[in-house]
Amino acid sequence: MSINIKDLIMKIAKENKIALNMDNLNIELKSLGIDSLSAMNLIMKIEDQIGVQLPDEKLLKIKNLRDLINAFEDVLK
């Protein structure tokens, strides 16, 4: 089963009324209006959907959408 992390992030963000734009993956989450609590909520929902948990060291490195996508793609390898 292949999981498209970008699509899953967009789906969960939309369900939670978080406006995301995948056009520029390097924009910091803070600049998108996503505070640390919203980011953790989003991450936990993604973890629940795909059945994995990100290690703490990966969580601490997530600053933008690219980091978020890469973190999940890495644990799914």
From Swiss-Prot:
Q: Does the keyword Lipid biosynthesis apply?
A: yes
Keywords, ordered alphabetically: Fatty acid biosynthesis, Fatty acid metabolism, Lipid biosynthesis, Lipid metabolism, Phosphopantetheine, Phosphoprotein
Entry comment on modification after translation: 4'-phosphopantetheine is transferred from CoA to a specific serine of the apo-ACP-like protein.
Query: PROSITE patterns from the entry?
Result: CARRIER, PHOSPHOPANTETHEINE
Carrier domain location is: 1-76
Pfam assignment, any one: PP-binding
Q: Which residues carry this modification: O-(pantetheine 4'-phosphoryl)serine?
A: 36
Q: Which residues form the signal peptide?
A: none
Q: In which pathway does it act?
A: Lipid metabolism; fatty acid biosynthesis
Q: Which domain of life is it from?
A: Bacteria
Purpose? Carrier of the growing fatty acid chain in fatty acid biosynthesis.
What is the protein named?
A: Acyl carrier protein homolog
Name its species.
Ureaplasma parvum serovar 3 (strain ATCC 700970)
